[in-house]
Amino acid sequence: MSLAIVYSRASMGVQAPLVTIEVHLSNGKPGFTLVGLPEKTVKEAQDRVRSALMNAQFKYPAKRITVNLAPADLPKEGGRFDLPIAIGILAASDQLDASHLKQFEFVAELALTGQLRGVHGVIPAILAAQKSKRELIIAKQNANEASLVSDQNTYFAQTLLDVVQFLNGQEKLPLATEIVKESAVNFSGKNTLDLTDIIGQQHAKRALTIAAAGQHNLLFLGPPGTGKTMLASRLTGLLPEMTDLEAIETASVTSLVQNELNFHNWKQRPFRAPHHSASMPALVGGGTIPKPGEISLATNGVLFLDELPEFERKVLDALRQPLESGEIIISRANAKIQFPARFQLVAAMNPSPTGHYTGTHNRTSPQQIMRYLNRLSGPFLDRFDLSIEVPLLPQGSLQNTGDRGETSAQVREKVLKVREIQMERAGKINAYLNSKEIERDCKLNDKDAFFLEKALNKLGLSVRAYHRILKVSRTIADLQGEQQIFQPHLAEALGYRAMVRLLQKLSNM
């Protein structure tokens, strides 16, 4: 047989489109031609495959070899096609049994010795192979992450020779499901960060509890050293473990940039904290071959932006659309790549360049403070459901070893109960309610509606802010076991508008 057809998977975001690899051997001057829009790393497969075949004691055909990667208009990159190209050459030269090739897909890079190396984006390939009712063969290096999602359809091998002997029926390859799934163990209780580590700041802890219960975006505002970063880092310890679907979605994104997933706690929600010097591609994704950014790596978890005004304004404004849609689409000349970006945004900032806007520590004028705060656009600040001031601790607080409030485990138990209520009522968490669902689940009596409208007019808030206040009020009512939203719930939600009050105060000075 001079023609062989082998199947593999490309990597396009969290999608893994099918690639059909056609290998043809013909008479003529020996050579190797690769067609089908390959990137440079794919073109280099010629040398890797030749050396791998020879070092695995196979014959490299002294013929004209033509390899077509179809569809031709699909960009291909990386070394993920090395193994299927090698299998195609062996099948076309009758060095292996090709009768069962149509039921397999292959994704792995080849070392010059014939060893298989892992590649990025294996989890999307596994999920796609499952839908196609084919079995996938990968490198042992990817076996741990494959064990998280594979369903008796993924084999792993160490060498090219192992794969050939398996296809010839001479030996068996282990299934990825045979790896001990340490991920099944619940590690959430081993989080060493606890709310009781933080002295005081009970008001901020209350806001953190509300944010965790309703998955609301949260902004901490206050001088340096008051515990803003510590508070934010405790949030993931208050959140429930991810569901299987959420964990698979997050793992699919993570596998695009890592060969090894942390399968010990793969169901724990991610916490991403990029530095304020992060560029647009680093935060939202990008590159010639688009890769996920921090917002996608934080999918189903928390994105924490410390020193918020120090980020470039255009970078922060790029978050506005993903915060609403839960996804980011990166357009290139030859493709549009979509990544998930459903994350909870938590940010911390100082109220002025010196860190203070009142008291003896303040060394800036109201005009300087306003210029500093104007680095943040109004539409971006509108995306925060809660903004709360985290003040300096009162004198004597550091020596106080008394009650520090509820532990993270106690708060987490409350959060789990409240989220169950929300899922039973609307099938989603409060933060994701749309306008119709807000009208249905956040009804107010006439007196309370008038109270809220009066407050909105006084604070000059937008319709988006109105909806966010109602959703926060709904979460507060859920925490208190109330079916109806009442004025105290609205008043507390309005109290979490520290940034609005600060801007009003500065404009009146």
From Swiss-Prot:
Binding site for ATP: 222-229
GO BP term, example: establishment of competence for transformation
Annotated keywords: ATP-binding, Competence, Nucleotide-binding
One of the record's GO molecular function terms: ATP hydrolysis activity
Keyword check for ATP-binding: yes
Family under the similarity heading: Belongs to the Mg-chelatase subunits D/I family. ComM subfamily.
Cited function: Induced during competence development. Not needed for DNA uptake. May be involved in a recombination step.
Protein name (Swiss-Prot/TrEMBL): Competence protein ComM
Species in which this protein is naturally found: Haemophilus influenzae (strain ATCC 51907 / DSM 11121 / KW20 / Rd)
Lineage, highest ranks first: Bacteria, Pseudomonadati, Pseudomonadota, Gammaproteobacteria, Pasteurellales
Recorded name of the encoding gene: comM
